[in-house]
């Protein structure tokens, strides 16, 4: 059975709620197509600021780089609007895109 490592970045605001549903869909897909998914949850955005004081902890970057895929939820919200640019939740999103060499959100789903 094929096995995949996925880093889960729930983000903040509505992100956790949406990501939880995406994981349910992925788990059903794994059952149907006979593959296994191992999840590693890390912080990004406002949730990371609240937990670690920074929008993109190095641990998150390292986990994403070691994974086969990343599930990313929404990032940002009024709670963090008073922070400076480099400390805002959105800095985590830009940082992870840069660290992974990405420039756009890709939404099509592919079964391997």
Locate predicted features.
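Anion-binding alpha/beta catalytic cores of soluble intermediary-metabolism enzymes, centered on
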Residues: 1-13, 31, 36-38, 43-112
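Short N-terminal binding/cap micro-motifs at the start of the first secondary-structure element
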Residues: 14-19
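Short, function-defining helix-loop hinge/capping sites that tune catalysis or transport
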Residues: 20-23, 76
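Short catalytic helix/loop segments, enriched in acidic residues and glycine
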Residues: 23-33
């Amino acid at each position: 059975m094929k096995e995949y490592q996925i880093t889960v970045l729930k983000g903040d605001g509505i992100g956790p709620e949406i990501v939880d549903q995406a994981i349910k869909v992925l788990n059903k897909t794994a059952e149907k197509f006979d593959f296994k998914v191992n999840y590693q949850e890390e912080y990004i955005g406002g949730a990371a600021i609240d937990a670690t004081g920074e929008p993109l902890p190095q641990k998150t970057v390292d986990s994403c780089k070691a994974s086969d895929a990343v599930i990313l939820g929404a990032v940002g919200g009024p709670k963090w609007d008073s922070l400076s640019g480099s400390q805002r939740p959105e800095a985590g999103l830009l940082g992870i895109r840069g660290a992974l060499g990405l420039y756009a959100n890709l939404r099509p789903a592919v079964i391997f």
